[in-house]
Every structure is written in structure tokens, then in C-alpha cells.
Amino acid sequence: AIMKHLMTSADSVFVIDELGYLESSCIPFQENIKSLLDNSRVLAVIRKQSTEFLDSIKSRADVLLIDIDNIFSSISCIIMASGMSKRFGTNKLLASFNNNTLFENAINISHFVSFGKTLAVTRHDELVQICEREHIHCIKHNMPYRNDMVRLGVSRILKETNRHKSCCTQGILFLTKTSLQLLCLLFIYYNSSYFACNSTDKSSNANNNYFNNNNINNNNKICRLAFNENAGAPVIFPECYYNELLTLPQGKGGGFIAKKHPAQVVLVPAQDEYELYDIDTPDDLIRLSRYLR
């Protein structure tokens, strides 16, 4: 099957359901796998066993290795929940949606990914109580500006973790599991040593073919969810932007940094336009609820 693929369809992806201990004893098979990796794109499941054969695959410079048991632990999630909801009339994060509050919905969405740490930043006592009930770490504050809230969240992440990458998640009220996981997976891909060694093109858009080395040659990528190239939230920043996150201009959030470094931004396609919606008024929430029925 491998030789037929290389002769007839080497440009397509060859899928291997498992490479493990048994394959380590067959030299001809190992040679075919090496030829396959040298000449075609491959998607393979590989066991965590340590053998000379498996280790040689995992150590290749052109292999992106993802540990599915620990895939997103290097990313921390910061839920920004300090808005005053002036146009809504009451705290919109306490409004009912799908038998939960909007804030509880955001917490549930954050569970779609096994983040290394999840943290909420809020000024509202009611949201602190929800965090305590849901076992979510929380910072209660009375700071006036968005940049203050970003600084509080990032500072806590840096203090309590080993330099985790930061995910500012304001605007995740309606994300699907697929979109959030894709955003995090592409962040890991674009900020991996594999991508840094193999990227050539300077495109900043991931919508067309986001696994085809189409960004500039470094691993300082900001990944941002978008729909039809219209950027939204959440946004994930690698650690090289921590100082900028800690020193944002008054009233600015993470989007300010993304706009400052457009060549470093990868737009990750959301599954549906509604995932990027924000709720400013009760009518907005009613319209969205009807749309999702």
C-alpha cells in the first residue's frame, strides 16, 4: 500500500492508524515508513513506547508530534468577565441562555479544551460565586479599564504557572467545540519548532489551507478566530507578547496587540458566523436564541 501510494498519489495524505512495538521488529516495513515520510504527507497515530524505530520518527525535524493526553496543557485560558453591560440594562453575563447564564455558558465552553489553567477576571460578586461553585479560579477587582483586567489575568497566570501561553477568551460566549479546539491546535502548530523550520510563505490567513506552511518563518504567531476573514475573539498569544499584554494602553485589550502585529496574526476559521457574535442588548440575545433553534 505504501509503495502504491508513493507511485500514484504521493501528493495526498497517507493515514496510518497505529505505529507501535510490533512494527519495530520488521526492518523492511521500517524502511518503507522512512521512504513514506521522506516523500509524502503522513497522518499517523504512534504509541508512546520507546523503541529505536519509534524514537527515530518522533525525533525527525519534519514531524509535528502531538500528545493527545496532554495536548493543550501549555495554554492558559483567561475569561474576561468585567463588562458593565450598560446597553443591556443589567449584567448580561447573568442573562439566561440554554438553561444557564451566559457566564456559565462561557465556562462550559472553556471545558471543551483541557487548558493548563482557566481563570476568570471579574468585578461582579455574582460571577465570583459562580466561579466558586464551578471550581474556576477567579480574580475579583475594581479596576476601571480593559487593560487593567488583561494585566491582572496575565500576571496571575505568570505567577502561578510555568510560563504558560496565554489565551484571552473574552467573546467565547457561543463558540463550538470544533472552533475552540481548532484554534488551540493551530496555535500549537504555528508556534512549534516544526513550523519554524519548514515555513516559507508570508500569508497571514489560515482559512484556505491552514496546514500548508503558509506563514512567515518564525514561531511567534498570534492565533485569532475569524469568520470570512473578519477577526474576532478569542485570541491566543505566545509568551513573547506577555510584556505587551502587561503594558497595554489605557482601555485597550488583546486585540490592540493583534492589530499592531498583523503579519504575525493567523486567522483561524470559525465554523459559523454566530460564534463571534457579541450581545449588547436583550434583543440581540433574543435574535441569537431564535437563530440557534
Predicted feature residues:
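ATP-dependent small-molecule kinase phosphotransfer cores
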Residues: A1-D11
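Hydrophobic positions in the central parallel beta-sheet of the AAA+
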Residues: F14-D17, C77-I79, V235
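Short, polar loop motifs at secondary-structure junctions
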Residues: R47-T51, T122-L127
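N-terminal glycine-rich phosphate-binding loop and ensuing alpha1 helix
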Residues: I75-D125
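Conserved donor nucleotide-binding strand/loop of the catalytic core
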Residues: E132-R146
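Conserved beta-loop-beta/alpha segment of the NTase-like Rossmann-fold superfamily
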Residues: M143-L246
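Conserved alpha/beta core of the MobA/IspD/sugar-nucleotide pyrophosphorylase nucleotidyltransferase superfamily
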Residues: N243, T247-R293
